[in-house]
Amino acid sequence: MKKYIVALDQGTTSSRAIIFDKEQNIIGVSQKEFNQIYPREGWVEHDPMEIWATQYSVLQEVMAKCNITQENIAAIGITNQRETTIVWDKNTGVPIYNAIVWQCRRTADICDELKERDGLVDYIRENTGLVLDAYFSGTKIKWILDNVEGAREKAEKGELLFGTVDSWLVWKLTNGKVHVTDYTNASRTMIFNIKNLQWDERMLKELDIPRSMLPEVKNSSEIYGYANLGAKGGIRVPIAGIAGDQQAALFGQAAFNKGDVKNTYGTGCFLLMNTGEELVKSKSGLLTTIAIGLHGKVQYALEGSVFVGGAVIQWLRDELRIISDSSDTEYFATKVEDNGGVYVVPAFVGLGAPYWDMYARGTIVGLTRGTNRNHIIRAALESIAYQTRDVLEAMINDVGYDINCIKVDGGASRNNFLMQFQSDLVGKKVIKPIITETTALGAAYLAGLAVGYWSDKEEIAKLWFASEEFEPTISEERRNKYHKKWKKAVERSKGWALED
């Protein structure tokens, strides 16, 4: 009987289920979007029951579509939007509040208050690898406990559970029998110590979070529990792989070795570098995070995020309306020889790594009477590559060694103009894989390894093939000249929203 691996890919806007075979071919895909809830400006929520309902229905749907029963499934792997926080009642399994999404800024005030505490900012950097920010789960848990009536009392009595989305899905799939997370997701909570690989007692105390709420932290590849996908008495399918979305993509790109780098070009860009067993502290405000946890050992990674990547293309389409389809950008960008001296800095929500300026705002500089639509489209596309170079330079500076290539994935990696310009700008080879579903593939690999579907990482590495490679075509002098101009444009955007 042919066996398959199912990856559940629970993202920020949709839940997906993808079936892979042993040769990593995609046998079937199902996807359902769910509601984004915006109760106030800067607040973002999801309904945890809707997350579960959409995720379970796409799992059933893809199995039916491919005519596959649970007997055919060797294991289930889970990958998920990170940091998003769910708190539920241990006895009823009902969430006490909506999921607070990673994008939600409601806990910024809590962060400001914590910044006043003696040495806490440095302690967080040193022990969790993160920066004190509303992005991470810790302050979101505190907010729920402080603001939902009766929550703190229930938590003190051990009646509430916390989990990131992976924990919630495992809890639901196992009918409330298993409460776990993996090292990668734990490393995004701001309450997990990435040195001793334990929940951090000081952070729990600072945020007033009872230890009893927290899931057990496990490897990213092991059997956590079993899901019964059919009627009672049916075959139980092992749930055997978990990783946060960006770490799953790193694993799905077979970036197993120290110095391997991947960039996911989505709405934002996420650049991760595997630093092996070395925990590298960034001097440039990059995050130190756990890349993967296997056999009780972890590999670390440096992570830098660009807030506005592919979103700049959506802006050209939806707000400026100078393109009708995202794929048009490549056509228009190649109709001009260069950017005509125009630079777009898409600091719509400030600038992330390595600038960390929340008051920066978007700018278009270098306009002349000869500037046309094509120059602006080209400059907007180029901004994605410039921001990636900024993060990559910071990474190389932090680790003290160079890299050979960048493995790429995500929607905007389909744009060949952008990929060639990226290669030109960083002076490195840019490689696209044959399977672009790297996040789901990473979760599938982790699940498959745990049940012996694939024997080891070496076997997986042999399955990884490039579909396209882009080599630099311009001189070092020229790329540095371009970049110098970009840096000048960035300076113009900094601090713009500060009150005079």
UniProtKB/Swiss-Prot annotation:
GO CC annotation, single: cytosol
Pathway: Polyol metabolism; glycerol degradation via glycerol kinase pathway; sn-glycerol 3-phosphate from glycerol: step 1/1
InterPro entries registered for this protein in UniProt: ATPase_NBD, Carb_kinase_FGGY, Carb_kinase_FGGY_CS, FGGY_C, FGGY_N, Glycerol_kin
UniProt source species: Clostridium perfringens (strain 13 / Type A)
Gene Ontology terms, MF aspect: ATP binding; glycerol kinase activity
Keyword Cytoplasm recorded: no
PROSITE patterns (UniProt xref): FGGY_KINASES_1, FGGY_KINASES_2
Reactions it catalyzes: glycerol + ATP = sn-glycerol 3-phosphate + ADP + H(+)
The protein's name: Glycerol kinase
Gene: glpK
Function summary: Key enzyme in the regulation of glycerol uptake and metabolism. Catalyzes the phosphorylation of glycerol to yield sn-glycerol 3-phosphate.
